[in-house]
Amino acid sequence: MSDDWDDEPIVDTRGARGGDWSDDEDTAKSFSGEAEGDGVGGSGGEGGGYQGGNRDVFGRIGGGRGGGAGGYRGGNRDGGGFHGGRREGERDFRGGEGGFRGGQGGSRGGQGGSRGGQGGFRGGEGGFRGRLYENEDGDERRGRLDREERGGERRGRLDREERGGERGERGDGGFARRRRNEDDINNNNNIVEDVERKREFYIPPEPSNDAIEIFSSGIASGIHFSKYNNIPVKVTGSDVPQPIQHFTSADLRDIIIDNVNKSGYKIPTPIQKCSIPVISSGRDLMACAQTGSGKTAAFLLPILSKLLEDPHELELGRPQVVIVSPTRELAIQIFNEARKFAFESYLKIGIVYGGTSFRHQNECITRGCHVVIATPGRLLDFVDRTFITFEDTRFVVLDEADRMLDMGFSEDMRRIMTHVTMRPEHQTLMFSATFPEEIQRMAGEFLKNYVFVAIGIVGGACSDVKQTIYEVNKYAKRSKLIEILSEQADGTIVFVETKRGADFLASFLSEKEFPTTSIHGDRLQSQREQALRDFKNGSMKVLIATSVASRGLDIKNIKHVINYDMPSKIDDYVHRIGRTGRVGNNGRATSFFDPEKDRAIAADLVKILEGSGQTVPDFLRTCGAGGDGGYSNQNFGGVDVRGRGNYVGDATNVEEEEQWD
């Protein structure tokens, strides 16, 4: 199962994944596992000991209820909560707030999520059937354990105080699809009454309007920012506007310039120099630049300025700008940047993304907003319900377009761009770190007479990141990680391969007195946002993340990136280490290379290190010898394919490439 950080159209946030736990082989397991010893299927009731008796997490039988606290992973350290830092008597790792840890129920023990472990559970669109087994009397049973046998009363209607908020009854572990499955039928083939479900959604905290907080979140230019002047730039298209050299020469509104200055921006980056005049002139744009190069400001500044310069009447449910992002975290980041640049103007900025209350977001949107930032699934949900239409849309921005293609959003992108309500006279802007041929051909359906801008990659910016590669097998990784973090742990992101591995490593580090949190696709949206807040404000020194967090995380003061597990694609390596050393600042990246597992990217890794002036270890050269890899040493993430004879799409005459130094 992949890390699905994409957006679900309708989400029951507290019940997400309803018992669907996967290991490296993509096999699904009940959260409570197979009951052994005293585990009793994770003590399904009062504490909901997560994975109580499952041997495959810590290599031993969990201790049932997790000390009565509902601790994550059941018997982890005498019932201590998630990450080991909170111990006996607490209801969850954040303490008593509900969540999906102890007492609340949902998809975790007790209320119906896993239904005692060996009983079937009602996840997803009807859930898995659960494990059949025989009791001591030899009776075959499925998901109908007596209360005494399953370690606590399930109680379909817990009081709010007991479960941390109003929840759905039995089977709320899935995505709340109202259809019958095997768990609706008892052993006598009688239909089990399907009681009414209640659903609880996460409502994000209101964004701050404090100027200091709004303008202090960005990353200031570093001492190596001047290197950006040496990055090569290629521009393709007809009648291309000339680049700007200063924000003051970009014909932006005064209030936008004031907010740019408050943000600490002094000189535009190469992508901003080229993109701002193109967008201001009314042209479509396909822009290719690496993460951390200022892409977000490159499209927000001219768009917001244009809205102020040429105001149109604001109609409810008809945004004038639609910005689509592949991940929730990136959408939130763009939302915060838009609020910053539109500060003290009359422009209204809205956001819609999955894992949060649809009703709450709809209330915000129906107040009217000029700009909507959205993830694809949730945006289409609003569109399908006619809460959002595109009659007044003047700008459409597809950010991280290559990532959207990788995540399977190509059809969603087509549905948005070709929607019957889409205003014909709109500008389409596509931004990405890479533009492979496939996505350029699809873009040809949407863009007209567009300008293609490619900003040089790797060399200049990555040379600001000191890259170190260690040869470490999988059994030595934890001790090596402790050794590195003992020197300096603050502001460290550790990338791992699996969601389960992220939680396990976060728990391990917390027990070693390194305040650690994790972020991945199986965590509830409230927990994902809380994890980022804790890491940003320094209360958590270390953030464990899966590879999908390698894009979109623009966090101040990230000092160190550690590849605990190497990615399978070299592009992901570049994106990961790009979390540090941003906007001309120094950074540090450390990678654990396991020759048995990571040999396939060795040749590409050697090219990356050589291209950025880094030391290449002998063991890595040996592993990469004879392999050519798939990585190209070209300095650009994409080449305009319109000049090729077999291209079908925009028929614009393409001038010879310009190179702007």
UniProtKB/Swiss-Prot annotation:
Motif segment (DEAD box): 399-402
EC number: 3.6.4.13
Acidic residues biased stretches: 1-10
Sequence repeats, residue ranges: 93-99, 100-106, 107-113, 114-120, 121-127
Impact reported for R551A: Reduction in RNA-binding, drastic reduction in unwinding activities and no significant change to RNA-dependent ATPase activity
Motif (B30.2/SPRY domain-binding motif): 184-188
Effect of I256N: Fails to bind and unwind RNA
Protein name: ATP-dependent RNA helicase vasa
Gene for this chain: vas
